[in-house]
């Protein structure tokens, strides 16, 4: 492939997990890939150029885009993957904790997207792939605030896609289910635990241990990201992996009460009265 025809991709949160797998898969697909991490010492390997970027800091984002654009003269693909979760009852999570997570999961997406849109518009095209979650369209007991942040990403992405499609830019969602990454190990615990939920915490730990045994590898999600990035006529959303596809179908076609019962059974919650 000639140098001038090589497309440039940026993957935020590329130090590990889905971001790292995506960076490697995009490079294998022919992209010149820049990954971002909050730490300068991270090496994604495989030829991915790692840059320092804090998605909560507009100056850091501007510096990152200036570096990429200065070296390549274009940005064809932005994959917004950086994010983290809070696990626990919604009542136990403080507003400050929730704000910190939304600052990354939602407003980080907003900041990087607003920075890249003028560049994509000037080159008359581009694609933005936002990593959401099945928890962006289903109830997420004991991860309510994380689910809320992904619901917000879904609404933002769908609306933005309509706004910029006429400019040659598409905004696409990729929705993984449980994935074998360090995400579950890095879940932030609520900062104001309540005694009434003490027994639930032990149950949640058991639940996580069980679901992670059958969780998808990050490469499964990365493969779907490449598909979303390269499709000539992309869908607005892509379920990533068999479990995500199953949940998506159930959400669309199963009656609400039956779906609620299925959620409670999956999460090992008491039956509905």
Indicate where each model-derived feature is located:
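Conserved glycine-rich cofactor-binding loop
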Residues: 15-16
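The beta1-alpha1 cofactor-binding region of Rossmann-like NAD(H)/NADP(H)-dependent oxidoreductases
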Residues: 53-63, 95
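Substrate-binding pocket helix/loop in short-chain dehydrogenase/reductase
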Residues: 89-90, 97-99
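Active-site loop immediately N-terminal to the catalytic Tyr-X3-Lys motif
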Residues: 91, 138-144
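Active-site helix of classical SDR
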Residues: 113, 149
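Residue(s) in the substrate-gating loop at a strand-loop-helix junction
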Residues: 133
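C-terminal beta-strand-loop-alpha-helix "lid" module of Rossmann-like NAD(P)-dependent dehydrogenases
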Residues: 165-212
């Amino acid at each position: 492939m000639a140098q001038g025809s090589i497309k440039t991709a940026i993957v935020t949160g590329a130090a590990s997990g889905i971001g790292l797998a995506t960076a490697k898969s995009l490079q294998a697909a022919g992209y010149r890939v820049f990954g971002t991490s909050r730490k300068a010492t991270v090496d994604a390997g495989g030829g991915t150029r790692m840059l320092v970027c804090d998605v909560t800091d507009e100056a850091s984002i501007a510096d990152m885009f200036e570096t990429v654009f200065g070296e390549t003269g274009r940005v064809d693909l932005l994959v917004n993957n950086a994010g983290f979760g809070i696990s626990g009852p919604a009542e136990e999570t403080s507003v400050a904790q929730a704000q910190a997570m939304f600052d990354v999961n939602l407003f980080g997406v907003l900041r990087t997207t607003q920075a890249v849109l003028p560049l994509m518009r000037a080159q008359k095209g581009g694609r933005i792939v936002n990593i959401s979650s099945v928890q962006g369209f289903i109830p997420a007991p004991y991860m309510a605030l994380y689910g809320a942040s992904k619901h917000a990403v879904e609404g933002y992405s769908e609306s933005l896609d309509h706004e910029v499609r006429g400019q040659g830019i598409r905004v696409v969602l990729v929705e993984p289910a449980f994935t074998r990454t360090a995400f579950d190990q890095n879940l932030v615990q609520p900062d104001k635990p309540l005694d009434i939920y003490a027994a639930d915490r032990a149950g949640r730990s058991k639940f996580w241990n069980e679901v992670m045994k059958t969780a998808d590898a990050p490469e499964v999600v990365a493969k779907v990201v490449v598909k979303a990035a390269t499709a000539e006529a992309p869908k607005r959303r892509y379920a990533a992996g068999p479990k995500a596809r199953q949940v998506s179908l159930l959400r669309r076609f199963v009656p609400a009460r039956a779906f609620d019962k299925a959620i409670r059974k999956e999460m090992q919650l008491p039956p509905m009265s």
